[in-house]
């Protein structure tokens, strides 16, 4: 398949080399990662078709994963949408007020005034009446093998529900990107991949989002394929016997205003994903977004 080459940046700091690749869409990324005519590693786990790899990656082959990228992951889309709808039914968790009460305002709320409440006047929510800010969201799709597809689906549904809620209420407009990073055990070489999924102001395409955020093949086929194409600076040899260790990305380099870490580093225990329905997990994810919009990390730490 023909594709446009991604933008490639090479940087070096303290004898550690980073290769960073920027993609304008999921199809471009998957096509580049799957190009077997290009120079790549001798290890090709992304293309492996054993029964063990099929179970681990969620697809029998790279071609099967590519088909989901091109035509959509129907089962995943349906499950993602149902999870998002389940969250949306919990209106109190996602809906910001369209007006705010105070001691002064445009008009009174009569029942409150009769009851003697001093905060009985209301105005339009300033956030909604002003110009909505634009955010650049980056979601790290790194995940260790202990997370299965159902866990990733719940995680992705919660993130997309926050994005959908904030945009539909006019609180902000959000550009959505996924990213992934890996490094050698000694940190001498790193590779980073950034894929834009949605421009600010565009509607959420659940076909694209379901595969990109919740399918194991996004990491274990497509992103592994991306890693296999990083051949400069003896990357394969320096990674050791595998694909290195998952890593986080630098917010300043990304130009991110919102950054969701890999699910292993999100601060939410895996037991919650195993035991609880998605609407019970959502408040924790919403809390993470509140932290980020206050200028802190997803986990609530100071930047």
Question: Which residues does each predicted region cover?
Answer:
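Acidic, low-complexity intrinsically disordered regions
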Residues: 1-157, 161-303
């Amino acid at each position: 398949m023909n594709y446009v080459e991604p933008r490639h940046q090479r940087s070096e700091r303290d004898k550690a080399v980073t290769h960073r690749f920027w993609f304008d869409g999921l199809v471009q990324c998957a096509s580049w990662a799957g190009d077997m005519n290009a120079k790549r590693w001798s290890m090709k786990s992304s293309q492996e078709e054993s029964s063990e790899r099929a179970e681990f990656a969620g697809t029998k082959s790279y071609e099967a994963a590519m088909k989901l990228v091109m035509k959509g992951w129907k089962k995943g889309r349906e499950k993602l949408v149902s999870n998002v709808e389940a969250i949306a039914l919990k209106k109190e968790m996602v809906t910001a007020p369209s007006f705010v009460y105070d001691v002064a305002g445009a008009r009174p709320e009569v029942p409150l005034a009769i009851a003697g409440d001093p905060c009985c006047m209301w105005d339009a929510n300033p956030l909604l009446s002003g110009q909505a800010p634009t955010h650049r969201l980056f979601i790290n799709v790194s995940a260790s093998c202990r997370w299965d597809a159902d866990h990733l689906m719940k995680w992705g549904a919660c993130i997309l529900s926050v994005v959908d809620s904030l945009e539909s209420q006019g609180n902000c407009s959000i550009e959505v990107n996924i990213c992934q990073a890996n490094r050698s055990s000694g940190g001498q070489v790193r590779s980073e991949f950034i894929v834009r999924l949605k421009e600010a102001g565009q509607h959420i395409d659940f076909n694209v989002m379901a595969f990109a955020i919740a399918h194991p093949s996004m990491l274990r086929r497509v992103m592994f394929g991306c890693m296999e194409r990083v051949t400069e600076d003896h990357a394969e040899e320096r990674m050791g016997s595998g694909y290195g260790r998952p890593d986080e990305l630098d917010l300043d380099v990304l130009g991110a205003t919102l950054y969701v870490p890999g699910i292993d580093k999100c601060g939410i225990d895996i037991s919650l994903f195993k035991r609880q329905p998605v609407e019970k997990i959502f408040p924790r994810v919403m809390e993470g977004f509140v932290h980020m919009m206050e200028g802190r990390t997803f986990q609530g730490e100071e930047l």
